[in-house]
Amino acid sequence: MTLSFVTRWRDELPGTYTALSPTPLNNARLIWHNTELANTLSIPSSLFKNDAGVWGGETLLPGMSPLAQVYSGHQFGVWAGQLGDGRGILLGEQRLADGTTMDWHLKGAGLTPYSRMGDGRAVLRSTIRESLASEAMHYLGIPTTRALSIVTSDSPVYRETVEPGAMLMRVAPSHLRFGHFEHFYYRREPEKVRQLADFAIRHYWSHLEDDEDKYRLWFSDVVARTASLIAQWQTVGFAHGVMNTDNMSLLGLTLDYGPFGFLDDYEPGFICNHSDHQGRYSFDNQPAVALWNLQRLAQTLSPFVAVDALNEALDSYQQVLLTHYGQRMRQKLGFMTEQKEDNALLNELFSLMARERSDYTRTFRMLSLTEQYSAASPLRDEFIDRAAFDDWFARYRVRLQQDEVTDSERQQLMQSVNPALVLRNWLAQRAIEAAEKGDMTELHRLHEALRNPFSDRDDDYVSRPPDWGKRLEVSCSS
């Protein structure tokens, strides 16, 4: 089957990119590809028989027209000026059978005009982390970019140490970022900002294209998508680590996996990025940062969208966030209805977990085994303050009884939203260390496990992290 590629970005948004081709690595070789995603995209298996080929930037497929996009952004709350695709190249936009498109973005593809002081490369460590994280999030049901392939090489790349250069093929419906809009707003080119908005509406919000109020309705949906995404991050214990405006997806996708982390111990102020000295991107600050980023996006639209309309959309953020978060957390607790005491029960559980540094994922998974008329719980042994747990658990079981559903019905719901497996940093690190020694077994094994996060397991994938696993530090180079 011949794949079809279109060139919408190149044709419709002149002045927003530089056309250039990838720079291949030395002795590139394919070490992993996403069979399930490839099937979804109707990619012939024969394409993966070439060790590098398009996956290593050595060849292009017919219809591809590679380019690097320019954008700007606020980093850690400070205007950083021009950024752009410093090590990634958009190879092409695949046209799927249903008429939608999928970007093929090659990360680690070499120097671009936007590389600044960088080398344009990615390392094996970071490409493995992103591939694992994006697929883990996808199977958790959270909107995200996807990983299609990883290529490693003999090219040395200099970070904290010398590491093997690698490339990741990332796919997504769009790589439109808040930073694209900021770039042209701060260059005082409001017509370019409007062109970006029109492009987004035409291709991703086409039902609004003929509406006279299209910009307000579109921005309101961007706000809602962002609020929903952040709510989902918070419920699974995901910390992004570097929520700069250039890392914010217009479509509400999780984008740019760097120093991310899933909670081990429940620590509301968890900081996963060791470069985040002030804790701006701590776990509990993510909802506020997302709103701040939306405010920066709204500012770029102010030349052609009424400020009152923008503020009205921004004002809806908190309610959308709380609605999505509340619905998901009630499911995690097994509540079939909404009752006035629900928030108090959840907050008391969080307080208990924070005091005892309870494992976030394991706590909710074990809570899924609760029988409403039994005081026995395997979760009790996870707490030192048994009296405090017993008091909370007794009131929790009374609350469960109000819903008048069977234990099996409720347990089935809870186990469908409380994962047994999340991508803990130590699991990724173990796969990385093996891969750097040439053994890809654990990389493939972990990828396969992450496809079924809600299934019970009896291996160390669902155990508490070892002591060394809790001390892992990750930075933006991750």
UniProtKB/Swiss-Prot annotation:
One MF term in the entry's GO annotations: AMPylase activity
- The record lists ATP as bound by 84, 86-87, 107, 119-120, 170, 177, 256
Q: Which InterPro entries match?
A: adnlytase_SelO, SelO
Enzyme Commission numbers on file = 2.7.7.-, 2.7.7.108
Q: Where is the active site?
A: 246
Reaction(s) catalysed (UniProt annotation): L-seryl-[protein] + ATP = 3-O-(5'-adenylyl)-L-seryl-[protein] + diphosphate; L-threonyl-[protein] + ATP = 3-O-(5'-adenylyl)-L-threonyl-[protein] + diphosphate; L-tyrosyl-[protein] + ATP = O-(5'-adenylyl)-L-tyrosyl-[protein] + diphosphate; L-histidyl-[protein] + UTP = N(tele)-(5'-uridylyl)-L-histidyl-[protein] + diphosphate
> Is Magnesium among the key words of this record?
yes
The cofactor named in the record is:
Mg(2+); Mn(2+)
Spell out the disulfide connections: none
Record's keyword annotation contains Hydrolase:
no
| Family according to the record | Belongs to the SELO family.
Note the HAMAP family from the entry. YdiU_SelO
Q: What does this protein do?
A: Nucleotidyltransferase involved in the post-translational modification of proteins. It can catalyze the addition of adenosine monophosphate (AMP) or uridine monophosphate (UMP) to a protein, resulting in modifications known as AMPylation and UMPylation.
This chain belongs to which protein, by name? Protein nucleotidyltransferase YdiU
Q: Which organism is it from?
A: Escherichia coli O17:K52:H18 (strain UMN026 / ExPEC)
* Taxonomic lineage: Bacteria, Pseudomonadati, Pseudomonadota, Gammaproteobacteria, Enterobacterales
